[in-house]
Amino acid sequence: MKFGNFLLTYQPPELSQTEVMKRLVNLGKASEGCGFDTVWLLEHHFTEFGLLGNPYVAAAHLLGATETLNVGTAAIVLPTAHPVRQAEDVNLLDQMSKGRFRFGICRGLYDKDFRVFGTDMDNSRALMDCWYDLMKEGFNEGYIAADNEHIKFPKIQLNPSAYTQGGAPVYVVAESASTTEWAAERGLPMILSWIINTHEKKAQLDLYNEVATEHGYDVTKIDHCLSYITSVDHDSNRAKDICRNFLGHWYDSYVNATKIFDDSDQTKGYDFNKGQWRDFVLKGHKDTNRRIDYSYEINPVGTPEECIAIIQQDIDATGIDNICCGFEANGSEEEIIASMKLFQSDVMPYLKEKQ
């Protein structure tokens, strides 16, 4: 079993941005002592939904502040920045950490990011393909050249070279069937969303396994990750109550930050996300409290026994034994770390790989 901790860097109303950044560093350091293998950092821009615009920089700090902790991105919006610049950043982190960096990537969801950074969102899928292929070439060969409709430059040497053979491990944040297939065609592990239930996770893995097998990959050796919103307390109601205020503000901030729901009909390739939002509305999840209640049904929020049951059900259904939890909804920094420690002592030891 492996365990990760993802850090949202959401700015709740009661915290300043300086306090959020300080908490990010403290929680990252605390994760190493609480039995977590990896900390995952999210990329967001221009909104309190997430203050971390450059996870590479934050990863460098946390890798330097810890000794054994892996630090990953969940995820870099790959199409919005130059692939060579990003490949240099990844290799630098891989070298300086001696292989402790994890490179999580995604295609991107927010129209605002593409507009500000000057990337055509309609081309996001093609750019994702192109950028990844170029970066993979650089990681493997030490050189990159490009001559296609998206980018042109002569052969250059990628410095520094990768520390890890083939480059830092790559993960894909995957929600849609098309992204699942994209990852499977390349044998890349997925980070599965915390907003889907066990049945949906199993269906996503079945699709992945079918496509990956067709492309010659051994699916038993692919290190997928399950993600969760997590709160552990010996009092189940207290665990849920302490999270509700944070999650309410966080969900509302997400809706406000996301342009795709109200003006993305002209954007190609995002039908899954628009359909997902329609499903949320039909289920009543547009109402924040109902959405939080549903989140509690499918995420480990409650007593240690309740948390174990929810996670173990997903492990048994999917075979995934890499568990990534987010604890920031638990209140103050002290309360967050207390929940992390209780997860370490009363949940981690009792989770078992699928038999």
UniProtKB/Swiss-Prot annotation:
Task: List the GO cellular component terms.
Answer: cytosol
Q: Which CDD domains match?
A: Alkanal_monooxygenase (cd01096)
Q: Which gene encodes it?
A: luxA
Q: Which UniProt keywords apply?
A: Flavoprotein, FMN, Luminescence, Monooxygenase, Oxidoreductase, Photoprotein
Its function, per the record, reads: Light-emitting reaction in luminous bacteria.
| Superkingdom | Bacteria
Question: What EC designation does it have?
Answer: 1.14.14.3
Q: What is this protein called?
A: Alkanal monooxygenase alpha chain
Provide any one GO MF term from the record: alkanal monooxygenase (FMN-linked) activity
Q: Which GO terms describe its biological process?
A: bioluminescence
In terms of PANTHER family, this protein maps to: BLR5498 PROTEIN, LUCIFERASE-LIKE MONOOXYGENASE
Q: What else is known?
A: The synthesis of this protein is regulated by a complex control mechanism that has been termed autoinduction. In fully induced cells luciferase comprises up to 5% of the soluble protein.
| Enzyme kind, highest EC tier | oxidoreductase
